[in-house]
Amino acid sequence: MNRVYKWYLRMHNSNYAFIRRFIEVMLHIIFSCDIPSEVKIGKNCKFAHNALGVVLHPKVVIGDNCSIGQNVTIGGRAGKTTVPVIGNNVLIGANALILGPVTIGDGAKIGAGAIVVKDVPPPATVIPEASRIIIEKA
């Protein structure tokens, strides 16, 4: 996946629009991911499980040495014009949502299933709220 994506990025900056679009469609079909070629991804970033289910906004910026789990969404929020900026050495767990004009600081860890709508300072850890059992009376 990483090699295919690097080739895809090279096509973005060339006159081979048909090939770039073909690769984009194949990434979507095979890996069910939506990673536009406009996304700025730093060096040595890794996507778990070949970026399965990952959705990124075209204007997202991801720093160096980040690790992103499967089914992660990083994008905007309704009514907001800016999108998330992810720092260096950030770990984002599976099924995490990072939405709106937020900045994730260097070295931060976003736990699996977390929903981030506020800035995360370096090197904070964000975890989702624990599950609760709700018993309804019959």
Segments and roles (model prediction):
Residues 1-33, 131-132, 138:
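Terminal amphipathic alpha-helical/low-complexity segments used for targeting or macromolecular assembly
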Residues 11-12, 55, 79:
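Alpha-helix initiation/capping motif
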Residues 12-13, 52, 94:
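Residues at structural and domain junctions
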Residues 37, 42-43, 48-49, 57-58, ...:
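Left-handed beta-helix
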Residues 74, 133-134:
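Short clusters of hydrophobic/aromatic residues that line enzyme substrate/ligand-binding pockets
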Residues 125, 134-135:
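Conserved protein kinase catalytic core
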